[in-house]
Amino acid sequence: MNDRFRRELQVIEEQGLTRKLRLFSTGNESEVVMNGKKFLLFSSNNYLGLATDSRLKKKATEGISKYGTGAGGSRLTTGNFDIHEQLESEIADFKKTEAAIVFSSGYLANVGVISSVMKAGDTIFSDAWNHASIIDGCRLSKAKTIVYEHADMVDLERKLRQSHGDGLKFIVTDGVFSMDGDIAPLPKIVELAKEYKAYIMIDDAHATGVLGNDGCGTADYFGLKDEIDFTVGTLSKAIGAEGGFVSTSSIAKNYLLNNARSFIFQTALSPSAIEAAREGISIIQNEPERRKQLLKNAQYLRLKLEESGFVMKEGETPIISLIIGGSHEAMQFSAKLLDEGVFIPAIRPPTVPKGSSRLRITVMATHTIEQLDMVISKIKKIGKEMGIV
């Protein structure tokens, strides 16, 4: 077995795809200590800076004081605390749905919905750039999976039209795609779902707390909150805690509680995570200026990089991609940024298609204008050195 591991690791190394862990000794703030050195951080999903907010820390500590450090069991045995159900009620109010159910991670939530809802004879229509958890959920279900070209509504319509059978049709898409930060064309997806009698699931991991009124997400951004059957989200990005959730109808929640294996057999979310998430949601709803600052920062950085000659995709989310091309070149650019005191990781296959390795920049509400200008200057400098601009 070890011989096989060595051979496969050698291939990974030769392709420039070796992955290594970095050691952080501070939380994900705009400036961090990584491997013993200070860096500007432009790669965190802590979009609103709530993961290090003192109010969330206080609530997490209070949760531990009252309930302990762990739930002690699954939700269906001994781990269903009153605060679990309070959190679910607050998520449902936040997402404007009848009900919500909490999972231990967004990954488990995606897997749980797709693998339990979709059966043999059903058909899933999945965007080509959907998150790995959606792909794994499709694989675990017994349904047929048809992948449509990324955000290509002509291709989706063609595949819906060509699909026959009496089973359920299920369109699954990220709300905000994690690599490029582009937003799913939800109005057209809703139109096609109605025409072909399909149901819709959105993975709103990167939209929750960012898009829509009060950060409600993608559906609210488009004014389509009543048209979505399942909205999956995470508590670990803009909300600043950890865990995942599904917001849906009351009957669908009850179905997942009884059928989603990733819910039934998971240990319940810890009290500290629950209380931190509740506080994060409250802050998002009551401090809209935090979200506005995030989007303002993202717009500023994107505009300045465009003016510097980088080819940028249009967008308004805090995820900004600089396409470099080859894996080795992307790694070189990232390494040069590290030398300049900036951490922006290179994203390589299999996370993105071959030939599209990139720097994935993520902006936070807590980045200052001085920090934004500094990273712009350093990216411009290295881009010129490498002949990219």
Swiss-Prot record:
Gene3D superfamilies listed in its UniProt record: Aspartate Aminotransferase, domain 1 (3.90.1150.10), Type I PLP-dependent aspartate aminotransferase-like (Major domain) (3.40.640.10)
- Chain sites annotated for binding substrate: R19, H131, T351
Which UniProt keywords are listed?
A: Biotin biosynthesis, Pyridoxal phosphate, Transferase
Which BP terms does GO give this entry?
biotin biosynthetic process
The answer to whether the entry has keyword Transferase is: yes
Query: Any idea which positions bind pyridoxal 5'-phosphate?
Result: G106, Y107, S178, D203, D204, A205, H206, T234, L235, S236, K237
Q: Which reaction does it catalyse?
A: 6-carboxyhexanoyl-[ACP] + L-alanine + H(+) = (8S)-8-amino-7-oxononanoate + holo-[ACP] + CO2
**Annotated Gene Ontology MF terms?**
8-amino-7-oxononanoate synthase activity; pyridoxal phosphate binding
User: What Pfam families would the database entry show?
Assistant: Aminotran_1_2
Q: What pathway is this protein a component of?
A: Cofactor biosynthesis; biotin biosynthesis
Query: What cofactors does the UniProt entry give for this protein?
Result: pyridoxal 5'-phosphate
Residues with the modification N6-(pyridoxal phosphate)lysine, per the entry, are K237
Q: What class of enzyme is it?
A: transferase
Report the domain of life of the source organism.
Bacteria
What PROSITE patterns does the entry give? AA_TRANSFER_CLASS_2 (PS00599)
**E.C. number, please?**
2.3.1.47
The protein's matches in InterPro entries, at most eight in alphabetical order, are given as: Aminotrans_II_pyridoxalP_BS, Aminotransferase_I/II_large, AON_synthase_class-II, AONS_Archaea/Proteobacteria, PyrdxlP-dep_Trfase, PyrdxlP-dep_Trfase_major, PyrdxlP-dep_Trfase_small
Q: What does this protein do?
A: Catalyzes the decarboxylative condensation of pimeloyl-[acyl-carrier protein] and L-alanine to produce 8-amino-7-oxononanoate (AON), [acyl-carrier protein], and carbon dioxide. Can also use pimeloyl-CoA instead of pimeloyl-ACP as substrate.
Q: How does it assemble?
A: Homodimer.
Q: To which protein family does this belong?
A: Belongs to the class-II pyridoxal-phosphate-dependent aminotransferase family. BioF subfamily.
Q: What's the name of the protein?
A: 8-amino-7-oxononanoate synthase
- Species, as recorded: Lysinibacillus sphaericus (Bacillus sphaericus)
